[in-house]
Swiss-Prot record:
This is Arylsulfatase F. The gene is ARSF. It is an enzyme of class 3 (hydrolase). Keywords: Calcium, Glycoprotein, Hydrolase, Metal-binding, Secreted, Signal. Its EC number is 3.1.6.1. It holds the Pfam family Sulfatase. It comes from Homo sapiens (Human). Glycans are attached at N50, N117, N336. One of its GO terms (cellular component) is extracellular exosome. Coiled coil: none annotated.
């Protein structure tokens, strides 16, 4: 029996080593917190050069991590940019584009949305054992065939938990001084309808049974009264406030319409609660701000506190919310094993104004803004990555990177695999972030406006430092030389409101980041060579585009029967926020 003891001992050692190894692999997978702000300009943050806007928490995040200064969004509007972020693919590949002027999900009554065959970063991480949560703005669609099918709900894209706004802020969402009065009136009106309905049923049953003698005309008149009452109520509530400005927890609508000024604070509390619930396991939290999109709902604590009006107030409130999330990460002991990423979905909205008040963001030295497919101001966004011990603090990276890079990056750090049946346009950022390589893996980036290619960026691998950018199409500014499209509020992608360039306008962003002076064969010896190189790359890229249905074209038309409703249609106003408890459990779905 004695010879067996070493074997038993060795077996125990091996078992312990395997256990430790498995535990070590688990520990190597970081928690992931992705923070995306809505419509934030790259020039709005202190860490990107703004010395009049107070953003201390985001600035601290930048000091503690890596700051990307040429971080590029795949689109200059919300829905397509976010689809590219989630999938690591240009929106043209998934069909999250339009050949017309409606380039985002228009409302919650359209069947358009991110196709279900797309693989999101949440789905990828879920396969790696992550608990996945989305808190905040979605804007990737909701329903397909009925107001309750929720085919485009975040749960169908890999998220286990959802609390937030399935649409996006619009001007109707805030302020809403009559909200509480209408909620009370609707409650009384619905009670009246129920009483009349009970009376109709009672009289009908009584007449058919011979218990009461009432004319059918009276019964039909009461039925007609209910229908007319419902129609009158529905007709008086056609504003997006009632049908699009709502909050959901899981599948349930909790506020319709929502109190926009308190929504952000509730979402931060939800985020902190999510972090606490999952502090002992590996998780993904995608916190998608409603800030700083117009109409800029801001709490009283921050109203009037900045040097930049309501927009500045909203930015500084957003920064304080980022601080609360970062503090919670520290408080729950998650700091050292949590990768935090911060960005904006696209550039600031230059044309967002109320009188002389600027309600949109500042894009610094970069030309253009939100809605412009090629100009730098619409697509160059903040990019900050912090992962203590893995990513060096205080590092600055000027290489071109993309929001599409986040999916392959989280796949890399989690041990996941990228889908092999489709083109993934993003690249793993970790070698660049950790300093293992000098250059971005991107050689070309393609800049679309809807379904139209507007510009191409070329980053040669010759250590010249040049970043060439060729514009095939540029918007016509209104008024001329204004730098924006103030007549239409957003610039167009095609037709008479754009200028087509042949040969394309050429800039070297390393020398002219503001894209102020186009290069010519007379001023740039490499002009013709660069134009030809870019044209060849564009041709190769276009050959990889597989035709799909454009979600934001024909499907982006409203259907009344798809309008979400928290009650019995059309009596849909409700406030259940205080009544609904937070779902808990292994998958958090409700």
């Amino acid at each position: 029996m004695r010879p067996r003891r070493p074997l038993v001992f060795m077996s125990l050692v091996c078992a312990l080593l395997n256990t430790c190894q498995a535990h070590r692999v688990h520990d190597d997978k970081p928690n992931i917190v992705l923070i995306m702000v809505d419509d934030l300009g790259i020039g709005d943050l202190g860490c990107y050069g703004n010395d009049t806007m107070r953003t201390p928490h985001i600035d601290r995040l930048a000091r503690e991590g890596v700051r990307l200064t040429q971080h590029i969004s795949a689109a200059s509007l919300c829905s397509p940019s976010r689809s590219a972020f989630l999938t690591g693919r240009y929106p043209i590949r998934s069909g999250m584009v339009s050949s017309g002027n409606r380039r985002v999900i228009q409302n919650l009554a359209v069947p358009a949305g991110l196709p279900l065959n797309e693989t999101t970063l949440a789905a990828l991480l879920k396969k790696q054992g992550y608990s996945t949560g989305l808190i905040g703005k979605w804007h990737q669609g909701l329903n397909c065939d009925s107001r309750s099918d929720q085919c485009h709900h975040p749960y169908n894209y890999g998220f286990d938990y959802y609390y937030g706004m399935p649409f996006t802020l619009v001007d109707s969402c805030w302020p809403d001084p009559s909200r509480n009065t209408e909620l009370a009136f609707e409650s009384q009106l619905w009670l009246c309808v129920q009483l009349v309905a009970i009376a109709i049923l009672t009289l009908t049953f009584g007449k058919l049974s011979g218990w009461v003698s009432v004319p059918w005309l009276l019964i039909f008149s009461m039925i007609l009264f209910i229908f007319l009452l419902g129609y009158a109520w529905f007709s008086s509530h056609t504003s997006p406030l009632y049908w699009d400005c709502l909050l959901m927890r899981g599948h349930e609508i909790t506020e319709q319409p929502m109190k926009a000024e308190r929504a952000g604070s509730i979402m931060v509390k939800e985020a902190i609660s999510f972090l606490e619930r999952h502090s002992k396991e590996t998780f993904l939290l995608f916190f998608s701000f409603l800030h700083v999109h117009t109409p800029l709902p801001t709490t009283d604590d921050f109203t009037g506190t900045s040097k930049h009006g309501l927009y500045g107030d909203n930015v500084e409130e957003m920064d304080s919310m980022v601080g609360k999330i970062l503090d919670a990460i520290d408080d729950f002991g998650l700091r050292n094993n949590t990768l935090v990423y911060f960005t904006s979905d696209h550039g600031g909205h230059l044309e967002a104004r109320r009188g002389h008040a600027q309600l949109g963001g500042w894009n610094g030295i970069y030309k253009g803004g939100k809605g412009m497919g090629g100009w730098e101001g619409g697509i160059r966004v903040p990019g900050i990555v912090r992962w203590p011990g893995k990513v060096p603090a205080g590092r600055l990276i000027k290489e071109p990177t993309s929001l599409m890079d986040i999916l392959p990056t989280v796949a890399s750090v989690s041990g996941g695999s990228l889908p092999q049946d489709r083109v993934i346009d993003g690249r793993d950022l970790m070698p660049l972030l950790q300093g293992n390589v000098r250059h971005s893996e991107h050689e070309f980036l393609f800049h679309y406006c809807g379904s139209y290619l507007h510009a191409v960026r070329w980053i040669p691998k010759d250590d010249s430092g040049s970043v060439w950018k060729a514009h095939y199409v540029t918007p016509v500014f209104q008024p001329p030389a204004s730098g924006g499209c103030y007549v239409t509020s957003l610039c167009r992608c095609f037709g008479e409101q754009v200028t087509y360039h042949n040969p394309p306008l050429l800039f070297d962003l390393s020398r002219d980041p503001s894209e102020s002076t186009p290069l010519t064969p007379a001023t740039e010896p490499l002009h013709d060579f660069v134009i030809k190189k870019v044209a060849n790359a564009l041709k190769e890229h276009q050959e990889t585009i597989v035709p799909v249905t454009y979600q934001l074209s024909e499907l982006n038309q409203g259907r009344t029967w798809l309008k979400p409703c928290c009650g019995v249609f059309p009596f849909c106003l409700c406030d259940k926020e205080e009544e609904v408890s937070q779902p808990r459990g292994p998958n958090e779905k409700r």
